């Protein structure tokens, strides 16, 4: 099997993601792809309709039982189904599942965030079976902890955990910004582990970008591995993220100074 690519998308509407889905479909015809998706904005919208406030700590959603039920319904029932249908309309044999299905994701609870967990492991055989069959797994970020309780998982963390578990050397995190910026606001084309940690400590990287960067760093355990943060709304976003070094920000384990800012 060719080199596996793990791609994380946000949870915006299919209309907003039609271009990137076409990119995913094109790449999936050439190499195995695992698609992981979020749904934060749409979860917040549904919670607002129900009069439930959203609370975040360190860029991560604090999740109680009511919020979890909404998150699970939106992630698995709405967003996942839309993405699978969208890919199948493009001729891709996509299969939808969550980290709960088959015990795909092994989760470790983050107590201070409520019903939230990080990824501690992966049942690789499940994804391997789907990929070997020529299908594209579309994964919703839900998982059960050691007590069997279903938890919300940050989608970036889920994607990184899957990348590590599969030994994938490329992880693409699609977001709504064009990359990581330095203290002067310049977009960085490359970023090393040390540089990323420094920018976090200095408060330059803040809010929801922090867990995204942390997830990217956790995926760099393989030689030659890279995580790419790119604007999923840009034209040909995935194709450019994979082929154009100036598109987005590439994060590597290299210790040398970065190429610089754009």
Language-model region placement:
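C-terminal catalytic "cap/lid" subdomain
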Residues: 1-262
